[in-house]
């Protein structure tokens, strides 16, 4: 590329930066004026409102005046918010106005037009022509999808065809061109090398400048209700999904808001890691939660829900034996649709018998016993649904409570509590008596009426929580109804081996008030079938990350909970860590969906790690040969044979070397939290190190110790596998955990063993890693 072209491009950058500066100055001035107007409006709100309550017409006039003033204030606040958003985008553009250029000549046109692509659009000073096109604009799709030559894009007026004569990429920092490349179809390796060769961060970065064609298919898909993305570790699937969110918010900005979209992330740490991507693109963050928090909120306080990571920890630390086999058999069966069918049969059985009800009590007095409720319930016609019959029971119970309340308020304790009411309650009673014209100084029964009202107030307040519980059908003892499943004899059902042991274990946990993680969704499914629960219609798009860890039953539950939703489903079967996901269907299984509504895309190219780390890691998992490492070279992974007592000094030496190389994030990765705590105890007095736990919501640069199941989706400059021995990694179910740990490293990977190395390394060619012994 000739020097004069670079000079011309830099001159254009300078001109664009000047326009941005002028716009920032102009909007900042307007923003100050609008802000002052908002402050004045708030201060003088009631002075500008005409208040007159003498006549009905005056009341309406007052309401209209208040509404008008409130709408004026709301409009000013909205304008102020829009200006803030504009300023944020302009400030980002000022540093790096754009990252791409295409020259496109439409059919029947003589000249090509130069289109510059950035994270936001920018008009010229006269607001007539685009200086920068937003990367989400229809015309910008050609930058990601085509090489120079015939190309097209879909506009609102139909398909536009033409010829792309140039495709150019830029690296611009602080308004200066640092790199400039003319490229073919894919975003050029020179740009990717520059981006991927950088340091890891405690927050995920936007990939908008380096989106690949296959990622662009994910981002711009608008036709399929369920979009499944199976992507190798480091393939950019989560990044692409977040760019997809930004694209959809832009594309449907008149009908879709960020609070209409929800992201299920694997843990709070990952939520923090990705939290800066959407704001970087000028969009508000979507609603974020974890599946565990979502389920826990719906279960409520009646049961103590097991954390899924505690379930994983238990399975990984349990010795091989009958107890482990029973737990895993139970986890896998309860995740299946066969178990849901068993629950459906149980629900059908409950129409005839088996419902268990709680006593309705007040102040240790049984108003209606559970047995009496059961008799009433089963006396109703059984041709009705469970919910219809329960609603009739509810209405009957509310009548019984009302009758009880009327009797109970005559008791002495009610008057004693009435004497503790505050002055406002007495004033309210006086006002009510006056309104009924039942209060005057000349009558002798005023105090009786006052006492009756006081008693009524006290009783209504005390009985209100009970009435609310009855209205919510909480008189059903759902825990016991669910536990009864595990007391039944099953002859026609397909139950797993060890069913008797599974039943005993489940009964014991529920009797103690615990809900094992594998029972959470089945329990909620049964409970909500009995009590009825409306779906969430506000959320219109779900993004589910690490979908390989979701079972078919969990998918079915989410579909019912969010009936209007489209879903973007991301995962990698090679990174499955939960027992339910291994050797079973998961949310990534295409056949679980209506074939007319689903599309599955596969990302095979891995960008995170060096070629050496990926060549090593992909050999660990079946089918790993399909994964394509990005051509970025680095050191070979290193396996070190050491003693337990020698581990600390090796780790400290490696950390020093990482720092010397300029690395900023490095992790010691353990298989379990138990292992991580042991490592932390070993190192905490010798290095500045932080232990990451389930309660950790963010991490900073530096040295951390983290279990594999919390490191999912996160990347580090360098990673050390704390124990890669055969004693620690030998079960076939641990292969994907081992692979997940190895693929966290961007630039360097070290594996420590005291004793024989993991048999998983037998599948890796010795040319793909160094083997050293401590002291060599």
Language-model regions, residue ranges each:
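P-loop NTPase Walker
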Residues: 1-42, 189-315, 712, 740-743
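Extended, charged low-complexity regulatory segments
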Residues: 1-208, 212, 216-217, 758, ...
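A structural signal for short, well-ordered beta-strand segments and their strand-loop junctions
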Residues: 101-103, 228, 263, 569, ...
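Short, flexible loop/turn elements at secondary-structure junctions
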Residues: 106, 233, 265-268, 548, ...
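A positively charged, amphipathic N-terminal helix/segment that binds anionic biomolecules
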Residues: 171-172, 242, 358
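Phosphate/oxyanion-binding active-site loops and adjacent basic polyanion-contact surfaces
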Residues: 203, 207, 237-241, 393, ...
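Alpha-helical nucleic-acid-binding subdomain
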Residues: 249-542, 549-557, 565
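Conserved helicase motor core of SF1/SF2 NTP-dependent helicases
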Residues: 276, 280-284, 289-293, 300-312, ...
